[in-house]
């Protein structure tokens, strides 16, 4: 059986699909389904552990040399003709073992955690879990052998979790799981030592998403975290915090700035609603309630872990994707929301006064892992969570007359792309993480 695609995205032309599956990056032609480019992360997932071991050995060697030299100096100073001193023999270094996760520890996966295109779509940027790196590829569709060329692999001190690019596409902005934000240049210069990297800004909580926004020609960094916060900081002078956006009660996992209004921020996470903000003015414009709409599609898999389960526990909502679309026929603005591990897509109309009207709920037969939108044609592509068959994708069309989502038959294209995906597994037990956003939710022991 085929492993589902974990992340999918398209370019603005709608001609190419970029996808991740396990430790593979794949690029497909959306007309023929042919594979145009591929990259496989061959770095062992134990690389960071081995690196820790090597660093510990270096420290021990330095300490051993210092102790040996000190012992020799002391012996020379205290040596007397009438007293024979015991020679100081340095003990061999005890090589530290590579740490091995104990029983019950979560498995270590080698997969691509995030994926985004630069604004000019000349570069593809991802995050590898194997060695805590950001990977940058140049894209050349004239290269018929492989359209992807890795130009930089930068290791970070802590595991990155989200990336964005500056407005001019010269810089990658990287958020990590320890609350720090870094920047690196988009170029072919060699990566620098991770110890030389300095954080641009920080949170006291784990970061979940990062975006670069612009207002009147000035750039800002927007960061969302596990502690319900959205921080708006100046860029590049990020030590100047403009303000915080307060309105969420649970973690923030998804930040979206639509092209049709770059002062508008749409945010979602572990709450039962999505927030609409004027991020520059620090105004909460409206909230989109989701509970009644999504409740029929929640299952027992959305309940809290057993140790936190009570009689009053609700099935939990986690936002995995927020998208927007402008109907070219009517100029109406649409908001699309995907909740994690559900078999539906919610579609809303966004009015000029920022009020929201629910247009439709598209129900499908399988849970959806990820969705992306071809802005040029209004075509949605969804990655399906299936355990049999080779039809890993499903296509939907926005009806520009009714603003509803409709399933379209592109089974031949889906099968061609699915066949080109060479990541085979024997059972679902071998799937890499498909649904992990809800793990950001904080739990109380009381």
UniProtKB/Swiss-Prot annotation:
SUPFAM superfamilies per record: WD40 repeat-like
Molecular function terms, GO-annotated: enzyme activator activity
WD repeat coordinates: 107-147, 202-243, 247-287
Region (Disordered): 67-97
GO BP, one annotated term: tRNA (guanine-N7)-methylation
Major subcellular location class: nucleus
Cell location: Nucleus
Keywords in alphabetical order: Nucleus, Repeat, tRNA processing, WD repeat
Top-level taxonomic group: Eukaryota
Pfam family, one: WD40
Functional pathway: tRNA modification; N(7)-methylguanine-tRNA biosynthesis
A GO CC term attached to the entry: cytosol
Membership in a protein family: Belongs to the WD repeat TRM82 family.
Quaternary structure note: Forms a heterodimer with the catalytic subunit TRM8.
Protein name: tRNA (guanine-N(7)-)-methyltransferase non-catalytic subunit TRM82
Gene it is expressed from: TRM82
